Structure formats: structure tokens, C-alpha cells
Design a protein with these regions (language model features):
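C-terminal nucleotide
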Residues: 1-18, 114-259, 273-325
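A local structural micro-motif
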Residues: 39, 78, 95, 173, ...
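N-terminal pre-core extensions flanking Radical SAM catalytic domains
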Residues: 268-272
């Protein structure tokens, strides 16, 4: 039996329920972006990445699909950034979601026990080793409240950043400095524009400082920067929520926690906490007591990006992920 579906028709689907449609539509566009003939195939998708939790489930599927198609066709991307950009286009052009590039880059370029420093001006990257990461864990806590970033909320923040950059005569706030914030205040820009710009400018500096801290094996400093990041997301960018703030404040009560912050776009979803291995169970217990909802916990560490795996290894890793979840 042969069954075919026009991929062009998928592009006209209503995507208001993003988390239910983007995986299918992104996969369809990845097939389109592959040059040459793609042979027919049957596919089963298994995942332990929760959908709609702000953990980049869409990018994970896009990059995994592209990696599979490289293996299937024998046509491997010459440059890793080209692969990441192709997956981003799948979301932009086919799913209609104006996502950034960070999620696709880490899914493609991730290395075990490393962080990835990405400069979005020229898409240059640097692998940052995390030498003593084995002493710590990243505890991901899913608030299980919908990860909802409305189009109006997203556009308001994006437009505020564009407006601030325009007033400063910059191509983007990536070129701005803390001194430029005074210019915005002198120009009597609306308070919300100043706040959005302050978050972006300080977050860029925190990212640079975080990479430097990891290179010095200073996880204490790295944790402090995580805390500062969340506080800025909460007060200046205003994308946190009562649920996320509760998870973060609860985690910070535990002595073995170095830092905790929301992850993803905010407005629900997950937090990520850097914690010493011997304190992770205490963190989970405290959160269960403090958080009125039902949180889900995932223990994670920096791992490699998408790659081809034998079925035996894949099943073993999948079962391990289920146990850790």
C-alpha cells in the first residue's frame, strides 16, 4: 500500500495549538530542505523530552530528524551551522514560529561535559569545558503549568528591544553597553523599554562572565550568575510566573544549591538548578513541600548532540532517561 500526503498542505494548517503541530510540520519541511531524493521510510518517534515545557522539544526533533536523514541519504552537512540553520528554517517557514537559533545549535553541537558559547552576531561558537561537573547535577523541574508565550507578549518584548536599539543607533542590543542605559533614560524612553533593554544588556554580560567562570572551574560564580539571570528575567524582562518563582525560591533554600533560574521563554515551563550531587534529594523534598502544584523532576548533565546510535544503545539510553525522570 502507498499512502502520500502533500507537504504543502501542512503549511496551511492552523498552528494555534503549537505544541501539537510543530513536530509534524517541522519534520515535513526538513524533508523539503534535504537536497536530492529522499527514499521512503517508516519512522517511530520516542522521546523523554516533555512537550510544551520550554525544553526545546521542537529543536530536538528537528535536529534528530535531520541527523536521521543524513544517515539515510548519505548526504551529511559540511558545516554544523548549516544543519542548525536548516532546522531553524523548518520552524520559521513551515510551522510559522519565529524561534531563535540557540536551541538548534546546542542540539547539533553539544559535547559531553561542555557548555556552548554562541555569539548570534556571526554565529561563532566556543566549547566551554565544565571540568568538575561530576561533582554537580542540573536538576530540571517542570512546573507542569503550560509554557505559554502569547504572540502579543513575545512581540512586545521583541519590539521594545528593537526600539531601544534604534534609539541607541545600534543594529541590535548585542552592541550596547550598560552606559547606553543612561542614554535611554535621558531620552525619556518608556520604563518598560528601559527594563527590557537592561535585561538583555546585562544578560549578555552574564553569559560572557558565565563562560569565564566555567573556564576557571568556578561553579560558585556560575551559580550566582544563574540567580542573577532569573532575578532579571523576573523583574526586568517580566517573563516569570508565580509557579516558576516558587520553584526557584524553594530550591535556593537548600545549602547545596549553587543557582536556580527559569529556563526557556518563561510564562510557565521549567526551572534549572545547579546542585551538588549529595543535596539533590533534599532539593526535591523541599520543592514538593513548598510547591502547591505537582512538579516533575529530571536529573541532567551536559551531553553530546544528536548522533546516530545503534538500536541497542538507543534503547538503553531511553530506558535510563525514563528512570532518571
Amino acid at each position: 500500500m502507498h499512502y502520500s500526503v502533500s507537504l504543502k498542505n501542512l503549511a496551511r494548517m492552523q498552528l494555534s495549538a503549537f505544541v501539537h503541530q510543530v513536530e509534524l510540520t517541522s519534520l515535513g519541511n526538513i524533508l523539503i530542505t534535504m537536497k536530492g531524493t529522499v527514499p521512503g521510510f517508516d519512522a517511530v518517534i520516542l522521546s523523554t523530552v516533555p512537550v510544551g515545557a520550554g525544553l526545546s522539544s521542537s529543536a530536538a526533533l528537528e535536529v534528530a530528524t535531520y541527523t536521521f536523514l543524513e544517515k539515510l541519504t548519505g548526504r551529511v552537512s559540511k558545516k554544523q551551522e548549516e544543519k542548525a540553520l536548516a532546522c531553524q528554517r523548518a520552524e520559521h517557514e513551515f510551522a510559522g514560529v519565529p524561534c531563535g537559533i540557540m536551541d538548534q545549535f546546542i542540539s547539533v553541537m553539544g559535547q559531553e561535559d561542555h557548555a556552548l558559547l554562541l555569539d548570534c552576531r556571526d554565529l561563532s561558537t566556543k566549547q566551554i569545558p565544565m571540568y568538575d561537573i561530576n561533582e554537580f547535577l542540573f536538576l530540571i523541574t517542570n512546573s507542569n503549568t503550560p509554557h505559554k508565550l502569547s504572540s502579543s507578549a513575545y512581540c512586545e518584548r521583541r519590539d521594545a528591544c528593537y526600539e531601544a536599539a534604534k534609539v541607541l543607533g545600534k543594529k541590535s542590543l548585542r552592541e550596547a553597553t550598560l552606559d547606553d542605559l543612561q542614554v535611554l533614560e535621558i531620552q525619556k524612553m518608556p520604563e518598560y523599554v528601559v527594563k527590557r533593554a537592561r535585561h538583555v544588556i546585562t544578560e549578555i554580560q552574564r553569559t560572557v562572565d558565565a563562560a569565564a567562570a566555567l573556564e576557571k572551574d568556578d561553579f560558585t560564580k556560575f551559580g550566582e550568575l544563574m540567580n542573577q539571570s532569573h532575578d532579571s528575567l523576573q523583574k526586568d524582562y517580566e517573563v516569570s510566573s508565580v509557579e516558576l518563582d516558587t520553584l526557584v525560591s524553594s530550591a535556593r533554600e537548600v545549602k547545596g544549591v549553587l543557582g536556580s533560574r527559569l529556563t526557556g521563554a518563561g510564562f510557565g515551563g521549567c526551572t534549572v538548578t545547579l546542585v551538588r550531587k549529595d543535596a539533590v534529594n533534599e532539593v526535591i523534598d523541599v520543592i514538593k513541600k513548598r510547591y502547591p502544584g505537582k512538579a516533575t523532576f529530571y536529573i541532567a548533565k551536559p551531553a553530546g548532540g544528536a548522533r546516530y546510535m545503534s538500536t541497542d544503545i538507543a534503547k538503553s539510553d531511553f530506558d535510563s532517561d525514563i528512570e532518571n525522570a
